[in-house]
Amino acid sequence: MVGSAKIKVGINGFGRIGRLVARVALERDDIELVAINDPFITPEYMTYMFKYDSTHGQWKKTEVTLHSEGHLTFGGNPVAVYACRDPSEIPWGKHGADFVVESTGVFTDKDKAAAHLKGGAKKVVISAPSKDAPMFVMGVNENKYSDEDIVSNASCTTNCLAPLAKVINDKFGILEGLMTTVHATTATQKTVDGPSSKDWRGGRSAATNIIPSATGAAKAVGKVLPELNGKLTGMAFRVPTTDVSVVDLTVRLEKPASYDAIKTAIKEASEGQMKGILGYTEDDVVSTDFITDSRSSIFDAKAGIALSDTFVKLVAWYDNEWGYSNRVVDLIVHMAKQGTSQ
C-alpha cells in the first residue's frame, strides 16, 4: 500500500456482490485481485458465473481462464482460489492481500470478520451492515475513518439514502423523515412460496408479489450521520425486478424551501463534492435506465413532489448491485490512502 503500488484485494464469498466487486476491481488500475474464497462453488463454476451475468451482461474485458483447481487467470493475472469454510484458514497473507472483502453475508460482526486477520489480511471490508463494526458511506462520512482494521460499507440502500439526506440536512435541516425503498429482488428471496420462519412474507414468491419488508437502512443513516440519529426510519417493498431500486424519502424541513431550491442544492452537490456518488436527472427515466450505473444515488427531479415548503417527497434511484460494489472498492482505496498518509 505504498506509493503507486496496486492495492492487493481478496474476496470471501463469490455471490452477487463478490462477483461484481471482482469486475469493478479488474476494471481499475489501482487494484489487484489476488485471491477468492468460496466453499460452495467449484473453480469451473466460479469461472462460468463470473463470465455470464443475466443483469450486467457477459464479461468481455479480459480472458478468464481456469488453469488448475486452485488457480484462475483474469487477463493473464493469476488469482488463487480457495474453498475454506473457516475464514481463519484462508491464507490471505500468502498472496499479500492487504484488504479482504467479506461478502458472504455471514461474517458481519467484528469478531467473525476478524478471522480474516488470522489468515494474514490487514483490513476487512464487510459488504453489509454490521452491528458493531464502524460503518462508512462514501461521500458522507469516510473522512471519519481512523485506521480501523474491520469496517462495514453499510447497505446499498443506506448508500443511496445517506448522500441525499446529508445534502438536504446540511442545507435545510431535517426535522424527521420516513423512507420507503422499492427494492429489486435479492438472492435471499424465494422463486416460489417457501419456508421463511423469521419473515413469513419474505418467504412468498419473489416473482409474483410485491412484498413489504423491514429494513434498517434509514436508521443506519443515524450511524453515519449522527445529527440525524432518531430522525429517520423506513421500510421496504420487494418487487419482481432483477436489479435497480428506488428510495422515496419524505421529510419535514427545518427551514422552508421551494422544490426548485431543493433541486438546485442537490444538483450543485452532484456536480461538486459528491460527484460520482450523487447524481441528478430531469429526464423521464425508469428503473432499467440505471442498470450498471456506478453512482450510489441518482436524484429524480421530476419524480419528487412538495406539499408545502417544509414537507417534501424526494426520489432517488440506485443500482443496488453495481453502484454498491463500486463503493466497496472506493472505500478500500480510501482506506489504503489513509494508511499511507499516517
Swiss-Prot record:
UniProt keyword annotation of Nucleotide-binding present: no
GO biological process per UniProt: glucose metabolic process; glycolytic process
Binding site for NAD(+): R16, I17, D38, R85, N320
Pathway(s) annotated for this protein in UniProt: Carbohydrate degradation; glycolysis; pyruvate from D-glyceraldehyde 3-phosphate: step 1/5
Molecular-function GO term, any one: NADP binding
Enzyme's top EC category: oxidoreductase
One Pfam family recorded for the sequence: Gp_dh_C
Annotated site residues (Activates thiol group during catalysis) in this chain: H183
EC number(s) from the headed UniProt entry: 1.2.1.12
Keywords in alphabetical order: Cytoplasm, Glycolysis, NAD, Oxidoreductase
Domain of life where this protein originates: Eukaryota
Protein name: Glyceraldehyde-3-phosphate dehydrogenase, cytosolic
Annotated source species: Physcomitrium patens (Spreading-leaved earth moss)
